[in-house]
Amino acid sequence: MSKVYDWFQERLSIQDIADDITSKYVPPHVNIFYCLGGMTLTCFLVQVATGFAMTFYYRPTVAEAFSSVEYMMTQVNFGWLIRSLHRWSASMMVLMMILHIFRVYLTGGFKKPRELTWITGVILGVLTVSFGVTGYSLPWDQVGYWACKIVTGVPEAIPVVGSSLVELLRGDVSVGQATLTRFYSLHTLVLPVLSLVFMLAHFLMIRKQGISGPL
């Protein structure tokens, strides 16, 4: 093992990287509430793992979406566990995110020079809610269908462009296959990529600026 380590150390200086990570100063006022962001990230990683596993069985069509979820829950080995973990970690992620936002706000973590960290965090919050909205409809049961219809119908109230926005979201004048395809694409590709980009920016800024001091 030492030869393998030395080989990588010679080329990548991995010890310097490890020292930089482990030697970062942590202020004495930090407590368990400062772990809420990390708990949100943990829930996100569970979402990625379980969501990836479910893509092997889920079929994003109005005719087969519900039956594929039913098959996953009743026939696939541990399918019920994977979907349940996905569902409950999604709820936990939203809860941890809300608590994290409150902690940052109440401790003044959004103030100069951490404004951009706060902005990227707010964007990540919007993306998290978007995950919930798009994922809720994917089983295409009665609850998912009507939730999709209501959510995509909200922009109708916007003057002039409301109808166009509704049609853009639905892919048609009414909710159907095009809507499900859009939601599936957003949920499994667009939103994860955007989340990873803003998470990277968020973490790099935290790493650069450190944890905010006490009020």
Swiss-Prot record:
Subcellular location(s) of the protein: Plastid, Chloroplast thylakoid membrane
PROSITE patterns linked to this entry: CYTB_NTER
Gene3D superfamilies: Cytochrome Bc1 Complex, Chain C (1.20.810.10)
Co-factor: note: Binds 2 heme b groups non-covalently with two histidine residues as axial ligands.
Keyword Transit peptide among record annotations: no
Subunit structure: The 4 large subunits of the cytochrome b6-f complex are cytochrome b6, subunit IV (17 kDa polypeptide, PetD), cytochrome f and the Rieske protein, while the 4 small subunits are PetG, PetL, PetM and PetN. The complex functions as a dimer.
Function: Component of the cytochrome b6-f complex, which mediates electron transfer between photosystem II (PSII) and photosystem I (PSI), cyclic electron flow around PSI, and state transitions.
Homology family: Belongs to the cytochrome b family. PetB subfamily.
Descriptive protein name: Cytochrome b6
Organism: Cyanidioschyzon merolae (strain NIES-3377 / 10D)
Lineage: Eukaryota, Rhodophyta, Bangiophyceae, Cyanidiales, Cyanidiaceae
